[in-house]
Amino acid sequence: SRCSAGAASANDPAKRYVRFVDAQTGEPRRLAYGAALFDFEPRNVITPHAHRHMASAHLVVDGRLRVRNYDRVRDDGDAIVIRPTRDAVFEVGVVSTMSSERDNVHWFVPQRGRATTFDVVISDLDAGQPPYEIRALDPLAATPLADGTLRAPVIGFAEASARYTADV
């Protein structure tokens, strides 16, 4: 459906609501979403981790962050096969997104001081599955494969926090 995005005037854009439906039944689905600010002190890190059943966007609103992304190619026992897609420093106004199809693994480290991101997360994307799943990975200990992908071991979050510091 359509409705005005503010006071009615010729300059107002049309706003369309997005409704998600179940692919099998056509019934409307309710998704969970949230927005948050992540305030990084110079030593804070979001360690490398993979996702399921969710999508997110991370807008840098203050400072600078080194952002490393990987596509999730496949699960392989106690590891996840990943493909590097990005390793860049993001400044204010730059956004990193994540979904099942693209840049599913991310890793954020502040650069030269504090940083803040404004994040929007949507979960419950896969009907009949848990709302979300997050698994810590160890890309630095990954085994390179012949096709250019990396077999990264799944590790616990305590181990990831100890290994992946602001100096890595």
Where are these regions (language model features)?
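Short acidic-glycine-tyrosine-enriched beta hairpin
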Residues: 30-32, 57, 72-106, 110
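Glycine- and acidic-residue-biased ligand/ion/polar-headgroup-sensing regions
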Residues: 53-72
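Short conserved micro-motifs at the rims of enzyme active sites and ligand-binding pockets
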Residues: 109-110, 128-133
